[in-house]
Swiss-Prot record:
HAMAP family: LexA. The keyword Transcription applies. Its EC number is 3.4.21.88. This is LexA repressor. SUPFAM superfamilies: LexA/Signal peptidase (SSF51306), Winged helix' DNA-binding domain (SSF46785).
Amino acid sequence: MIKAKIEDSGMPPTRAEIARELGFRSANAAEEHLKALARKEVIEIVPGASRGIRVLRHDEVEAKGLPLIGRVAAGEPILAQEHVETHYEVDPALFKPRADFLLRVNGMSMKDIGIMDGDLLAVHKTQDVHNGQVVVARVDDDVTVKRLDKQGSQVLLHAENEDFAPIVVDLTHQQLTIEGIAVGVIRTADWM
């Protein structure tokens, strides 16, 4: 609706126009929806202007860097938080393939390949994965980072630390979703 108004008239709608168009009783309801869109980085609100709405282009959102999404277990799986905690000003093109988001590692199960507790794991969002790749996997509602080994209807998610046994997933009884592949690590200053 906002884009259509800008295309038709050359300027964004007022809060009152948005409220009327969407059937809200007041402009305050429209303002709350605009704030939600701004939090999701779809629009930018220009303070103090009744028509102070700017639709962000996708490349402008990318310019803010990579989003940090929750935490990922590198040990026992934990429930992932699905909201963006913050953005880091890191060029996604530094990683091959290109990183789509960052996850904070929790645990030491991947330490033997240099993924440490507290690291930021750069992840390329894909479900096209192969055995031997380090993946971010969701088993039921838990998220973990492990090395993939698919054998028929069974998947082994291997740790890179001999103190941890593999996670065995029986695809006939459990749900497994691949969230992406690890494409890099950013070490935080916590280890110094």
